[in-house]
A protein has these predicted regions:
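Conserved hydrophobic core element of enzyme catalytic domains
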Residues: 1-86
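Helix-start/capping segments and mature chain N-termini
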Residues: 36, 45, 66-144, 148-291
Length: 291
C-alpha cells in the first residue's frame, strides 16, 4: 500500500481527491456509516465560484490492463454526467480581408482551444486552421467567417456578408447584468447566449445598437457583442476579466500591444466618450442613450 502510493505520487500529475477513498459519518453515539466515494461529485467553494464541479473517475489497473480498455471503462463510469452535458457549441467569429486574411486567427484558435479544454470539447487546432485557410483561398471579398465546434470535435464553417456599419457614435443602453460573475457562459463564446440576446433585444427596442451590462456594484463589464474601452492619457481602459466577461480577441490584442490595460469602469467614466469593439468590427466610437 505504501509503495503503491509512492508510485502514484511519482507518475500522477494531480492528487486523486476523495473519489478513490471513503466518505462517511460518526455519530455522537459511536454509530458509524462509511462508503466509497466513487461516482461522487465534489463541489468546493473555490470551484463553485466558477460554477465548476469535479467528478473523479478511474479503474483498478493491474499488470495486464489495457490502456484503451481502461479509458473506455472511465467513459462508461462517467456517462451519467457526460450524457447530461449542455448541448451548446463553441463559436468564433472572425473577419476575413482579401489583403490581410484573418489578422487575429491565432488568438481566435487559442481562445477556442482554451474553452474546449475547460469544457471538455475535443478540438484539433491544426485541422481547424487548415480548413479555415483552405476556405479563405476561395473568398474574393471581405466577409464574416464563423467557426463552430461541437463537443465531439466536429467543425463547421460559415461565410456571411459583413454586417452593416453601425454609424458613429454607436448608441448604447445601460442594463442590469443578467447573471452572476461566476457564470461559466461569460468566459466562453458559445451558442448558449440567451441572456445576451435578451439584453440586446431590450436595448434595440429602446433604439440602441448595443447593451452595456452593469453589475449591482455599478461596475461595467461588457456589451452583448463588444468589449468596452475608455481612453485615458493615450491608453484604453477596459473592465477586468475577473468581473465576469468574455476575453475578447480584439481586447486581448490591444492589451498585448500595450494600447490597453484593465481598469474598473462605471457609467460615469463614459461621459467623456468611449469605444466599443470586437475582432469583426474593430473599435467604434459610442455613446449612452436613455430609454
Amino acid at each position: 500500500k505504501i509503495r503503491a502510493m509512492e508510485l502514484i505520487d511519482d507518475v500522477e500529475r494531480d492528487a486523486r481527491g476523495p473519489y478513490c477513498g471513503a466518505i462517511g459519518r460518526i455519530g455522537s453515539d459511536g454509530d458509524a456509516a462509511f462508503n466509497v466515494a466513487i461516482r461522487t461529485i465534489r463541489l468546493t467553494p473555490g470551484e463553485n465560484d466558477k460554477h465548476k464541479a469535479v467528478l473523479g473517475v478511474g479503474g483498478a489497473i493491474v499488470a495486464d490492463s489495457d490502456g484503451m480498455g481502461e479509458w473506455r471503462e472511465c467513459l462508461i463510469k462517467s456517462a451519467f454526467v457526460r450524457g447530461r452535458a449542455g448541448g451548446h457549441d463553441l463559436i468564433e467569429t472572425m473577419r476575413f480581408d482579401p489583403e490581410e486574411g484573418i489578422a487575429l486567427l491565432e488568438p481566435h484558435l487559442e481562445r477556442m482551444k482554451a474553452s474546449a479544454a475547460e469544457l471538455g470539447f475535443a478540438f484539433d487546432r491544426h485541422d481547424a486552421r487548415n480548413r479555415i485557410q483552405a476556405l479563405c483561398f476561395e473568398l474574393e471579398e471581405a466577409a464574416k467567417l464563423r467557426l463552430m465546434l461541437t463537443r465531439s470535435g466536429a467543425i463547421a464553417l460559415e461565410v456571411q456578408a459583413l454586417p452593416e456599419a453601425l454609424g458613429e457614435p454607436a448608441t448604447c443602453l445601460a442594463l442590469p447584468h443578467p447573471t452572476v460573475a461566476g457564470d461559466w457562459r461569460l468566459r466562453h463564446k458559445t451558442t448558449d447566449r440567451n441572456f445576451y440576446e435578451e439584453a440586446l433585444a431590450m436595448a434595440q427596442a429602446a433604439g440602441a445598437k448595443e447593451a452595456l451590462l452593469v453589475r449591482e456594484d455599478g461596475q461595467l463589464t461588457e456589451g452583448c457583442w463588444t468589449s468596452i474601452f475608455v481612453e485615458r492619457d493615450g491608453i484604453l481602459l477596459t473592465p477586468p476579466l475577473e468581473l465576469g466577461l468574455l476575453p475578447g480577441v480584439l481586447r486581448r490584442s490591444l492589451i498585448e500591444e500595450g494600447r490597453a490595460r484593465e481598469a474598473a469602469l462605471s457609467l460615469s467614466d463614459l461621459e467623456g466618450g468611449f469605444l466599443i469593439g470586437n475582432a469583426l468590427r474593430g473599435l467604434i466610437p459610442a455613446k449612452v442613450i436613455t430609454p
